Amino acid sequence: MVCDVKDLKIYYEIHGEGTPVLMIHGWSPDHRLMKGCMEPVFQTVNSSWKRIYFDLPGMGKTTGAPWIKNSDQMLDIILDFVDAILPGQPFVVAGESYGGLLARGIINKRPETVNGLLLLCPVVENEVTQDNGGKFQVFEKDDIFLNGLSEDDRNYFKAEGINSIQNQRVWQRYTDEILPALRIADYSFLGNLSGRFSFNADALEKPFMKPTLMLAGRQDFIVGYRGLWQLIDRYPRASFVLLDKAGHNLQIEQDILFTETVKEWLHRVETEMV
C-alpha cells in the first residue's frame, strides 16, 4: 500500500488487527528488517496487534525528496504518516538503530499518544557516545560457507562491526531481511541527510511512564550500549537487556532471547492498557 505524505508516497504494509504497533527500521535497510524479526514474535502471542511496517524516504520502496535534509523533517513525515493511517489513535512504537532515534522523537513530541516503546540497538546521542562500548568481535565463523559466497556477498556479510556470528543461519536471514534493502537504498539521498535532530529527543518534559524495552548488543560496534544505559532514568518502566554474542544485528544473532524479551514487553504493554 501507499500513503501520500506531502509530495511523498510512503510504502507500507499492515498485518493483523488490534492495538497498532508502528515499526521503524534503521538507516539504509527497509521494512523487511522489522518485519523479519517481529512477525515471528507476533505469531507466538494470543493477543491482537495491528503491525504497521513502512519504508522511510530514500529506503526500500519509498523514494526520497531533495527537500528532506535532516531528521527533524524525517520525524515530521512520520508524524504525518501516523496521522493519515491512525488518525487520533494511540499506538505502540518499535524502532531499530536510526529508527530508535526517530521513535524517541515521537515520544518527545507526542508522549500522550504512545503506549509502549521498543528500542532495538538504537542510535543515541549523549555525552558517552564517543566511548560507547561495543567492541566488535566475531564469535562464530564458518569459513567453508563464507568461501562459497561471491566476493561481493562476503564483503557485505563480513563488514566490520556488523555480524558477530558469520554462518549460514545468520546469512540466510541477513539476505532475506537486510541485504536486499542495502543494495537499493538511495545513498546519494542519505549522504545529504543529517542523521541528527536539532533537539535532544531524550530531554523529555517528564519521564516516559509506559512499558519500555531497551535491547543492546555487547559487541555492537555501530551504536554501542553505554549511551543507551544513560537514558534509563528517563524511561522508568524500561527493561534494559544487554546481550553477549550480539552485534548490531542482535535480533538475528540472538533470535531466541530477542523473541522472549519482546513477548514479555508486549505482555506488559497489553496488561497496562486493560
What is each residue range found by the language model?
Residues R104, N108, V114-G148:
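Flexible "cap/lid" loop of the alpha/beta hydrolase fold
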Residues A246-D255, T259:
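Catalytic histidine-centered segment of alpha/beta-hydrolase-like enzymes
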